[in-house]
Design a protein with these regions (language model features):
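N-terminal secretory signal peptides
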Residues: 1-20, 31-38, 43
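Short, glycine-/small- and polar/acidic-enriched structural segments
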Residues: 47-233, 245-280
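Secondary-structure end/capping motifs
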Residues: 294-412
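Sec-dependent signal peptide recognition
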Residues: 24-28
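Short glycine- and hydrophobic/aromatic-rich loop-to-beta-strand nucleating segment
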Residues: 141-142, 285-288, 292-293
Length: 476
C-alpha cells in the first residue's frame, strides 16, 4: 500500500501522524508467517480484504464520549487497519448529520436517535446505519443556582447532610408551578430533538409529574412544546453553560464535560445523571450511510475493528487508561476543556453541588457490559420515545419497531469485526456476546427511576405503562 501525501490539517483538526507503512508491512508479514505456521486460521484473513477506501474523514461533537474516535486515532488503531483518518469537530448535530448524508463526512459520532430518525424520515430523510455503539451513560441534568436554592430544602438528606439521590423531578414541580403562577415559562435545554438528552430529560420530568410537551409533525409543529409544563429547546452542548448563565434557560440535559463545567464555573448544580435515570442506558453510536457500507464493506469492518479496540482500551484494567484519555480529550482539537473538568466525570466520580463528589465508576462505559454491541432493543427504546412524544405521530405495530431496528442497527457488521479481532489474537471470545445465541434483544431492563420495565420485544406494552405520553392509537 503506497504512502500518500497528507494535506496540512486545518485548525482544530488533529494532526495526521506519520503513516507507519513499515509497521504495517511487518505486521502483514508476521500475519502471513503465523498463517503458514497454523497459528491463525486462513478464513479470518481470506475473508477480509484490503480497505476499498483508505483516506477517511469522521465528524464529532466536542463531548467526552467521542473518546473512541480520538483513541483509535491516537493509538494507531485506524492505521493498523490501513485507514488514514482525519477527525473534525462539527458545529452542531444537524451540521454533523448533513455532512454524513451529503458525503462530506464518511462517518460520525452520532446521537443514537439520529440514524433511526433519518431512516424513518423524521427530519432529513436518509438511510443511516450503525454497526457500533460508542458508550453507555455519560449525561446529566443541571439546574441553575437559583432553581437549586428552591428545590434543595425539600430533598431528603443523608446522615452527613448531603442530598439523598436520585433526585426526582417531583422536587422541581413546585418551582415550575411558581413560574407558571407568575406567567413565566420554565425553560430547559437539550441538544437535539432526537437526542438521548431530550428523551432522558423528558423521561425524568414525566416521572416527576411534569409534562415535557408533544411534537406534532403531521400538523407542522415540531416545537415539542404542545401541552408542556416545561419548555424544552435545542442548544449545542458546548454552549449550554453560557446559555444557563445568561438566564435564557433554567436547566439543561447534556453530556460531559458540560455539566461539570457548570460546577467549576459556579453557575449551576447537576441534580441527576442518566445512570440514575436508566442504569447503563445506550448513548452515542457511530453512524454512516448504508450506501457507504455497501460500497466499502472492507473499510466498514476495519473501522469497527479499530473502534472496538479503542473501547476496550478505555475500559481495561478498571479504567486504568482514563487519565491518559482525559489528557488527550483536553486537547483543543478534541473536547478542549480543562483536564480537571473532564477528569471529574471520566475517572469514576461525578460532582453534583460543589464539593459533593460521589463515586460513579460506570458514569462513562465504553466497553464493559457489551457496551459496543448494537442491540436491536436499544433502537426500539429510542423509537418508543419518538412515539411517546409524538415524533412518530401514529400507532405502529410491534413488528414495525423490529423492522426499523434491523434496518439501522447492524450487528452482522460488528460480528465480522469482532471475529477478525479474535482471530488476530487482539481480543478474546469472552469480550463479546455469544454471537451464535445472541438475539439482539437485551433481557427486560428494570433499573429506571420510575420502576418501569422495558422489554424491547414488546414496545407497545411498554408505552402503555406511562400515564404521561402517547400510547396505543392516541394522536395529537
Amino acid at each position: 500500500m503506497s504512502k500518500k501525501i497528507v494535506p496540512v490539517p486545518k485548525e482544530d483538526t488533529p494532526p495526521v501522524p506519520r503513516r507507519s507503512f513499515m509497521k504495517r508491512s511487518v505486521f502483514a508479514l508476521t500475519a502471513w508467517a503465523m498463517l503458514g505456521a497454523g497459528v491463525i486460521s486462513a478464513p479470518a484473513w481470506a475473508e477480509l480484504g484490503e480497505p476499498e477506501k483508505e483516506d477517511l474523514k469522521f465528524g464529532f461533537i466536542k463531548l467526552t464520549d467521542m473518546a473512541p474516535l480520538a483513541i483509535a486515532y491516537e493509538k494507531g488503531f485506524f492505521e493498523d487497519e490501513g485507514l488514514y483518518v482525519k477527525l473534525e469537530a462539527q458545529a452542531n448535530w444537524k451540521v454533523l448529520l448533513d455532512g454524513v448524508i451529503d458525503g462530506q463526512l464518511d462517518g460520525a459520532h452520532m446521537l443514537a436517535g439520529q440514524p433511526l430518525a433519518a431512516t424513518i424520515g423524521f427530519g432529513t430523510k436518509a438511510h443511516i446505519v450503525t454497526p457500533f455503539s460508542m458508550d453507555l451513560n455519560g449525561n446529566g441534568i443541571t439546574v441553575s443556582n437559583e432553581v437549586w436554592k428552591q428545590i434543595k430544602p425539600n430533598i431528603p438528606k443523608l446522615p452527613d447532610g448531603r442530598p439523598k439521590h436520585p433526585i426526582g423531578a417531583e422536587h422541581l414541580k413546585p418551582v415550575v408551578e411558581k413560574f407558571k403562577a407568575k406567567g413565566k415559562p420554565f425553560k430547559m435545554g437539550m441538544v437535539f430533538p432526537v437526542s438521548t438528552h431530550n428523551y432522558e430529560l423528558r423521561y425524568w420530568l414525566a416521572a416527576g409529574g411534569l409534562h415535557p410537551g408533544y411534537y406534532a409533525p403531521h400538523k407542522g409543529d415540531t416545537s415539542g412544546t404542545l401541552q408542556a409544563d416545561v419548555l424544552l429547546s435545542v442548544t449545542p452542548p458546548p454552549q449550554m453553560p453560557a446559555t444557563l448563565e445568561a438566564g435564557t434557560i433554567h436547566g439543561y440535559c447534556v453530556g460531559e464535560p458540560w455539566n461539570q463545567q457548570a460546577v467549576f464555573k459556579g453557575i449551576g448544580v447537576p441534580v441527576i445523571t442518566d445512570y440514575q435515570i436508566w442504569k447503563d442506558n445506550p448513548e452515542k453510536v457511530f453512524g454512516m450511510t448504508r450506501a457507504f457500507t455497501e460500497k466499502y464493506p472492507n473499510t466498514t469492518v476495519r473501522i469497527v475493528k479499530a473502534l472496538i479496540r479503542a473501547g476496550k482500551w478505555l475500559d481495561e484494567n478498571n479504567n486504568r487508561n482514563r487519565p491518559e484519555a482525559v489528557k488527550i480529550l483536553a486537547q483543543s482539537n478534541y473536547v478542549g476543556a480543562d483536564y480537571e473538568v473532564i477528569a471529574n466525570s471520566m475517572t469514576g466520580t461525578f460532582e453534583f453541588e460543589k464539593g459533593d463528589k460521589r463515586e460513579i465508576p460506570d458514569f462513562n462505559v465504553f466497553f464493559r457490559h457489551f457496551a459496543t454491541y448494537p442491540y436491536y432493543s436499544d433502537a426500539v427504546w429510542y423509537l418508543t420515545q419518538m412515539r411517546r412524544w409524538g415524533q412518530i405521530a401514529e400507532y405502529k405495530l410491534d413488528s414495525w419497531y423490529m423492522e426499523v431496528a434491523k434496518k439501522v442497527y447492524r450487528p452482522d457488521i460488528y460480528r465480522k469485526a469482532a471475529e477478525e479481532l479474535i482471530a488476530e489474537g487482539k481480543m478474546k471470545t469472552a469480550d463479546f456476546p455469544d454471537f451464535d445465541k445472541e438475539s439482539g434483544f437485551r433481557p427486560p431492563q428494570t433499573e429506571f427511576i420510575d420502576g418501569k420495565v422495558f422489554d424491547g420485544t414488546k414496545p407497545n406494552s411498554y408505552l402503555e405503562q406511562f400515564p404521561i405520553g402517547l400510547k396505543g392509537k392516541e394522536k395529537i
